[in-house]
Amino acid sequence: SPRLTLQLAPMYRFYNGGIGDIHFVKDNKIYITIDNIERLRRYEVETYLQWQPFDKTTIVFNGNFRHDSYKNPSLQLENSVWSGFYYASLTQKLPWKLRLTISSYGQIGHEAYNVYGHSSSWFSYSAALQRSFLKEDRLTLRLYANMPFNKYYHNESVTNQGDYTGVSKHDYLGRRFQISLSYRFGKLKASVKKTETTIENSDVVGGISKGQ
């Protein structure tokens, strides 16, 4: 029968008097200083979903979605945007002990970093096929491809400052292929200890930790 796990963790974060950048132009030069003037209001929700619609199929989704509002009252500046980071995967067990995993991760919306600017959305995807051999599946062969149909993935950072708008474009190498062979030593324990699964959203998207 289908098995579904869903976790939602809403949060609210705010501060007044945070350290923020102050940009100004003097003699055709851009100067940047800091002051304890920045205000932030953030509404955020972390999500984790694991669904097993069939015995050999597992779908996982892990995401962080938020709305940020940065304000600088003295300069009368505000940057209010929404963004999200996600990791999604589909794992399918195939005949001949093969296991196929297709995954995608990235950013949607615009991530704000101060009252002046934000970054654009981006995404990456990958596929992995593996098979185990020998007694107790000690030997594992894995074929991995990251963005096989796109050589690069792109990201932009936008800075708005009055009449000045700066755009910084970045291209990152995404296409990558890998073949790995691993061997496991030791014996598997007959009993399986109960584990607790939690969401661990740091800078790495899709972080899942399991502890005894």
Residue spans for each PLM region:
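Gram-negative outer-membrane beta-barrel proteins
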Residues: P2-L4, F14-G20, D55, H67-P73, ...
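Conserved C-terminal beta-signal and adjacent last beta-strands/turns
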Residues: N79-Q212
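Transmembrane beta-barrel architecture of outer-membrane proteins
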Residues: Y12-N16, R39-V45, F65-S69, W82-Y86, ...
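Outer membrane beta-barrel strand-and-loop segments of large Gram-negative receptors
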Residues: S1-N62, N72-Q76
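Detector for outer-membrane/organellar transmembrane beta-barrel domains
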Residues: P2, L6-Q7, Q52-V60, R66, ...
